[in-house]
Amino acid sequence: MEKNRDKINEFLEQFDLTTLIADGFDEAIVGIIMQDEHPKVVYDEYKCVDILIEEGLAEEEAQEYFDYNVSGAYMGESTPIFMHPISGI
């Protein structure tokens, strides 16, 4: 089975596009969108936090780290999107 990052890279190569991919969160990738002609990788926020917990952070610490250092970081037009899946609301 292909990894999520590989699928995103194949899509980008097919259309000669580039974007930013958040390191360490490949298993949380749910898709890619085009916004104002810029591709953006979409992540499941809850899975991202779970990945941080699996790496050894406490739940509250993982959420705080994610909010400040990951979803709160603006990196330009191709900044990834972190969404709340409807099942988690």
Q: Positions of the model-derived regions?
A:
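C-terminal alpha-helical interaction appendages
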Residues: 2-89
